[in-house]
Amino acid sequence: LWGLSPRGRRPGRRGALRVWVHPVGPGPRIRDNGKVSLYRDEGVVLRTQKLGEADRIVTLLTRRTGLVRAVGKGVRRTKSRFGARLEPFSHVDVQLYTGRTLDVITQAETLRPYGERIVADYARYTAATAMLETAEKVVAVEKDPALRQFLLLIGALRTLGEGVHEPRLVLDAYLLRSLAVAGYAPALGECARCGGAEPRGFAVHAGGAVCGVCRPHGSVNPAPETFGLMAALLGGDWPAADASTERHRSECSGLVAAYLQWHLENGIRSLRLVERS
């Protein structure tokens, strides 16, 4: 969805980024009792955690199934067939078996190793880490299809790896669009409370931009250019975003981070590592 507007409509050619689509394998196999036993999907590895001496629990955001937590058996062994493919930032095609508590990964093939370019640069790495954490918390419910969030994450990781735009801008664009897809798009061009034009302030707890009359206590006064930058990032206007100044980028990043932390219950811990100035 990196090349789509938050409401799913395609914008003009300006700023649109194509989404690379890989055909997934055959659909799920169904047991006699109607439950899925074996299924195939493509996904992005969000995080991993150790399990026992040789296994890992792998959390993925997948194209068709949504958020999936599955066990990769023996993937920590040096002779594992696909252990290296199940690392964070990797775009993989996986086959899984439905278990009683956690699914089990039986096959994994790399589609795009985004991590190779991302981990080589600190700014890209911290931005991508914040993206993965955000994706997991925004989707939240396991096995609830979230195609738009999946496509958005894939496009953001690809763009980050290409290095065309500053990592901070790519991160803020992803955060704004992810929130918009989840239903939390901030008001930018009009007052979040009365709908009036030419807002003067920004209040995270009020839903974004606010006018002078509706402005609540605790709101801040961003520069008009900062509102413009946020709108450009949300809408995919990269020429305008790339032309922004350091002052407005810093102000934008602060507002986006505050807005995100307000709407996600536990916040995003990895945002503290991101260079914001």
Protein language model regions, located:
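Compositionally biased, low-complexity flexible segments
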Residues: 1-27
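Non-catalytic alpha-helical scaffolds and adjoining flexible linkers that form interface surfaces
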Residues: 29-277
